[in-house]
Amino acid sequence: MSTFASQNESKQSMKLNDIAEFVTDKISSSGISLDRYVTTDSLLQNRRGRETAQNLPPMPCALTHYRRGDVLVANIRPYLKKVWYADSEGGCSSDVLAFRVKNGHCPSFLYTVLMQDAFFDYAMSGAKGSKMPRGDKDQIMRYELPIFTPLEEENIGNMMVDIMSKINVNRQINDNLEAMAKQLYDYWFVQFDFLNEEGKPYKSSGGAMVWNEKLKREIPKGWNF
């Protein structure tokens, strides 16, 4: 995703720590449900948000207490571009950075900043470690971005949230269509339970099957490969 910074070269710049801070509030893992727990593994690559974590920590521990409107970014392997605009309250593991917008700035604008390729490239430029590079928190907060008015921030942020919402809806539609295609293929070419002339599943209703030497399996009578 292209950065908006190149379109605003004439604007003065500020640093990320001028509009945001790391969340330091804590919450016990025993005080949240699984669907409110966020880890680097539950954050999805390429700005796809998150999925439900596999499990809570085995022992009660302190987690970063994120809130609605915070922006969560996986700090391990920043090039994977794992970011989520929180729509709920919960806890996240220590390898997830939770950013909270400062007073006078727009949460959705912060999300727009932190989802840009330029931000992830910058985070990688200061990352430490080879196998599992980890972003440098001090360096991350020095990331530069253009200065916008509060109204401009709101307009930019709202536009990006709207775009990402549409992308996610389209992605869900595509996922559903793919699942339907796989199910249809399975019915036709694995189970051979496509509908016969009577509207019943072919094989399950006693449809004739013959051995195919090439495929080494039975197939519906009359089919050729």
Q: Where in this protein do the model-derived segments appear?
A:
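Glycine-anchored helix-breaking recognition loops at helix->coil/strand junctions
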Residues: 1-2, 40-41, 76, 82, ...
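Amphipathic alpha-helical segments that form coiled-coils or helix-hairpins used
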Residues: 1-58, 149, 175-225
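A short beta-sheet element
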Residues: 62-64, 68-117
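Amphipathic alpha-helical segments
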Residues: 11-12, 110, 139-183
